[in-house]
A protein has these predicted regions:
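Beta1-alpha1 glycine-rich phosphate/pyrophosphate-binding loop at the start
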Residues: 2-84, 167-209
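Short hydrophobic core segments
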Residues: 9, 108-120, 249-258, 319
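C-terminal, flexible cofactor-proximal segment of oxidoreductases
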Residues: 323-395
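FAD-binding core/adjacent interface of flavoenzyme oxidoreductases
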Residues: 2-7, 83-180, 184-191
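Short, electropositive alpha-helical surface patch
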Residues: 167-184, 212-222, 311-318, 346-358
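FAD-site-proximal beta/loop scaffold in flavoenzymes
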Residues: 130-154, 248-316
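A Rossmann-like FAD-binding core segment of flavoenzymes
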Residues: 42-45, 82-101, 186-280, 333-334
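A conserved FAD-binding loop/helix module that cradles the flavin
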Residues: 173, 295-341
């Protein structure tokens, strides 16, 4: 029997959710591994770096509640239990309408291609971003460097902020993590007894001056200075330059740039959206290419509401729809499963927490059994994290 070849590029949230929903959830992984070795209709290959990082936990590096070891997993064992081949390579090109994947170590053909390759960040929008800012978007290395620099300071001015890419009509950025980082920084400095020696500023050109709401209230309660509507024209060493050529003192900057597509997206046969991302439709199908799918923060949405994100939980919903559509296509059935738009996350402030939620069908999270604001939500968030990481490590 000739097996259908499925190639998955990337080993982050979107790719792992796709695998989870495409294959049966194994209750007994050893039996499942044996069964897939004896009989499988598919030959699945994952191309990536083999390291999974649980990015939603990165802000908690600031309080010392999370560290690199706790949130990083060698994903090769997860794949091996499912009899999935892993290729430790960097994809350099995609050709032949998606059928040919070229890496730095070889070429791989496929019948179905799934793209969960992650984004690139618009670090050239503001000069000096690469040289003079740190970001949770860059992973544990950058967050550890931020903590080290913070710990070396006895006092100072810290700026936290974000920018989003609005060209595709939705929130293509990671503002939520930055709100969390700001509140956790306030908590960490208070725990050390030095909060009065630091100014914390929060800025974003994508928040209107005078904007109000629950998040703004939480920032103001903590004495965080709001620079809504502000965007520096350049980051400098210890300073930020304004458009009138004046300067603001900034001893430390934690900043999340807007999201766009990687060089692979721009330079391959993949269609590109206005915002520079993979142009995908409401079924997760890459437009104009047969049997090529994408999910996560590498791909645009089709006609999205302006508030929708595309990473983490939204990646899960889209990957689930893609898995169903790929199964239907391989079985000769219509691929017509769409996905709901949803923003759902718990904002941990250490001494408080909020469940931020919006959805296209107005359904509350988990049938509204959890409060929208309670410190107990931190425990709920930790349970979700521990369950998912346990699943990846052992099931």
């Amino acid at each position: 029997m000739v097996k259908e070849k499925i190639v998955v590029i990337g080993n982050g949230f979107a790719s792992l959710f796709f695998i989870q929903y495409f294959l049966l959830l194994p209750v007994f992984p050893i039996f499942f591994w044996f069964l897939r070795r004896v009989y499988s209709k598919y030959e699945i290959t994952v191309i990536g770096n083999g390291e999974f990082i649980y990015f939603p936990a990165l802000p908690e590096f600031i309080t010392g509640k999370k560290n690199r070891k706790e949130i990083t997993i060698d994903i090769k064992h997860f794949l091996k239990r499912r009899n999935i081949r892993f290729i430790d390579s960097v994809v350099t090109d995609i050709q032949n309408g998606g059928r040919t994947v070229i890496t730095n170590t070889g070429t791989y053909e496929n019948d179905v291609l799934f793209l969960g390759i992650g984004p690139a960040f618009l670090k050239d929008d503001i000069p000096g971003t690469r040289e003079h800012t740190l970001s949770p978007c860059d992973g544990p290395d950058s967050m550890e460097l931020f903590i080290n620099r913070l710990n070396s300071m006895e006092s100072g001015i810290v700026y936290l902020g974000f920018k989003v890419n609005k060209k595709d009509g939705f929130v293509s950025g990671r503002g939520g993590q930055m709100y969390e980082c700001a509140c956790l920084l306030d908590y960490a400095l208070k725990e050390k007894g030095v909060r009065d020696k630091f100014e914390i500023h929060f800025f974003s050109p994508d928040i209107s001056i005078g904007d109000t709401g629950m998040i703004t209230d939480r920032l103001q309660e903590r004495g965080i200075l709001l620079d809504y509507g502000y965007e520096p024209v350049e980051f400098l060493n210890g300073w930020m330059k304004d458009n009138d050529d004046s300067f603001r003192k900034a001893d430390l900057v934690l900043y999340s740039p807007g999201i766009t597509g990687s060089d692979l997206v721009i330079n391959s046969c993949l269609p590109v959206s206005k915002g520079g991302q993979i142009d995908a439709d409401k079924y997760g199908q890459v437009k104009g290419l047969s049997n090529v799918y994408a999910a996560g923060d590498c791909a645009s949405h089709e006609d999205p509401p302006p508030w929708v994100p595309h990473q983490a939980h939204m990646a899960q919903l889209r990957s689930q729809a893609v898995a169903k559509n790929v199964k239907a296509m391989l079985n000769g059935n219509p691929s017509n499963t769409t996905y709901r738009y949803e923003l759902s996350c718990i904002m941990n402030m250490e001494n408080d927490a909020m469940w931020l939620h919006m959805s296209s069908d107005n359904k509350p999270p988990f049938w509204n059994i959890f409060p929208s604001r309670s410190k107990n939500l931190i425990g709920v968030k930790n349970i979700f994290e521990k369950l998912y990481l346990f699943y990846l490590r052992y099931l």
